[in-house]
Structure formats: structure tokens, C-alpha cells
Amino acid sequence: MLKLKLDRHQWAGVLFALLCWCMPLVAQNENTTKPTHDSICLSEVVVSTRRQMMSANQIGSQINQTAITNAMGRSLGSLLEGVSGMSSVQTGTIVSKPVIHGMYGNRILLVSNGARLTGQQWGADHAPEVDKNSYSNIEVVKGADAVKYGSEALGGIVLMQPSPLPYDVSGLHGMASALYGTNGRRFGASGYVESSFKWLGNWAWRLHLNTENGGDRSTAHYLLNNTGMRENDLSLALGYSRDRWRLEAGYSLFTQKLGVMQSAQMGNEQLLQERIRLGRPVDFTPFSRQIDYPFQQINHHIAYLKAFYDHEKIGHFAFQSTFQQDNRRENRIRRLNHSDIPTVSLHLNSLQNSLVWNKGYQHWKSEAGAQLLITDNTNERGTGVVPIIPNYTEVAFGLYGLQKYTAD
């Protein structure tokens, strides 16, 4: 039998230790036995949102800025393939044209910042001359509502809009992104900066830059020589807002040089059959970033002026004047060292003027507009090749009116 002889001070220490040891057990027991609430009763909760009303004659799909940024390094046609009813026609490794329900080229209309894009869209190897990274929203519109943009919108339209200028934002804001692709060892960068001149009045501006550089692409087993590309883009916008008026002006430049695979230039049908039988090019050279003959070179300039006026009683007015210049040059391998002379050299100038009025009242919305389009196409002389597209001047004028009713 174990006997302990402790004085009163020692007994006090033992009792204190037992008390400290038992307190967590009691607390734990209290926590486990404490009732828990699986649900919380609230009073009335109202969740409200606004439904985007769309005409029964309009079928649209939108691509936001996040999706556009994530598609950096891809073509516009490749980006639009994610929209229902759309595909693309791809020529080579870079050129891609959007297709809406089997229609492409002049059967669909591309609208850039409020103006239709005028370029050489008749060829299957002519991609749209736009920098998709400069837009914050791309919308594909199909249906009867596309008719107001003209007869070229039979298949549908692709609306490309930048974000509004930051009139009410103070300080300098911007964003930058970069890419690198292993195929072709491509690298590129894109970004913009924007701000407002509060000290000078309600002015705002934005500058966007984009560049991309790539070398020869490759398949799983061999290189595709002379398939490099260069692209440099710039856009600048300036705006002023006061009361009911808003004025905006801007300029954009799109420059691109694309190499065409040398083995794709066939001299006759027998060479084509021989390449198909081999299943690969005959000659190979090491990887290079140099772009040699044959190649395509495109420069596209856009300058615009916009004026907006808002009035509560008479409605909203919008005027836009846009000038575009598209220069396309295509060089092939020619005999007698004449490769520097282009086989195709086209210069397309266009001037668009549009005036639109719209007003909403109760469940109705009225809209009317007029547009004047002047286009002039010129071929460079001395190429030694009969032009595919003749010289021409076109003047087109159109009017339209819309009346819509929206139910609750």
C-alpha cells in the first residue's frame, strides 16, 4: 500500500494541478454538447438584375476583353471559332479569315470602332488588317438587324469596339502582356496606357502598342522555311466631353509582313503532283527569322473623327467620318532578279461619313441613319502582271430606319 505524507501546502499544489487538468476537459465537453445551428432564418431577400433585351431578328455573341487577352498570339479568325456558327479559312500557318455559316470575304462585314473595315478581302490568303488586341469587346451579329450595315453583311457582321475613354478617371492606368511560342520561336508584347487631363478640362486619351516577331514554323518532322512574320501596330485616341457634347479623334496603324513557304510556289502541275507524292518539301534550310521572297506586306492606316450630342427631348445624334488607306504588296520569286518587283501592288483609299439618330420612349425605340462611302482602288504600274482587281472608283449612299418595340 502506497502512503503519501503531504503537508497542507503540498496538498494545495496537487489540487491546483488537478483543477488545471480538468478545465480543458470540461470546456471540450461543453463545446461538444452545445447545440449547433444548421440553418439561419432570414427575412425576405430580393435578388434583382437587368435582362439584356435582344431583338427577335438579332442573334449575337460577345467576346470580352479577358478572352481577347487570353487569345494573344492567335489570329482574329481563330478567336472567333469559339462562337456558334463560325469557323475560319486558314492559308499557310498565319493567314486566317473568319467564316459565318459558310460565308466569308465580302459576304461578311467587319466593323472597327464604328466604321466598316475596307481592305482587300477578295483573296483567300488575305486576312483582316486589324489588331484584335486593341479592342475590349468583339460581337458577332447575325440576322435581319445586320442589314442596316449594308449589303455586304449577308452572312453577318463582326463588331469590334475599344473600351470608352477614361473621362472620369484620374491618374495613369494601363496594362501590358507578353507571349512566347515554341513553334517559330515567336515572341510578342501588347499594352496600353490611358489617362485624362483634369487640369485642362474634361479631356481623355489612350495609347496602345502591339508587336510580334516569329521565325520559321515547323511540323512534327521538318521545318517550313520562310514562314516567319513581323507585325507592329499602333493606335492613339483623344477625346473631349462637355455637357451634352462629346468629340473624339484617333489614328491607328497596322503593319504586317508575312513570309510564304518557298516550296509552295509551284511552277507547273507536275511539280505539284511530285510534292504531293513526297508529302514534304524537297529542300530544307536551318531555322531562320529572315523573311525572303515570296512574301506579303500590308500597311493599313485609319484616321477618324466622331461627334456625339445627347438631348433628352430630341434624342441622341452620332456623326463619324473615317478615312482608311490600305496598301498591299505581294512579291514572288521571279526570273532575271526581278523578285523585288511586286506581282501585286494595290492601294485602296476610302472615306466614310455616317450620321445616326436614335431616341427611346416608353417601350419604343426609333433609329434612322445615313451613310456615304467613297472608295478608290489603284494598281501600281510596271509590275509586268495583269492586275487581278482593276482600277475603280465607287460611290455608295444609303439610308435606313428602324422601329423597335420592347415588352416588359
Residue ranges and their predicted role:
Residues M1-T32, L42:
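Bacterial Sec-dependent N-terminal signal peptides
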Residues K34-T36:
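Short linear regulatory motifs and low-complexity interaction segments
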Residues D38-C41, V46-A71, V89-G92, K97-P98, ...:
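Outer-membrane beta-barrel proteins, especially TonB-dependent receptors
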Residues L80:
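Active-site-adjacent helical/loop segments in soluble small-molecule enzymes
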Residues V83:
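Acidic-histidine catalytic/liganding microenvironments
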Residues M86:
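Hydrophobic acceptor-binding patch used for acceptor engagement in glycosyltransferases
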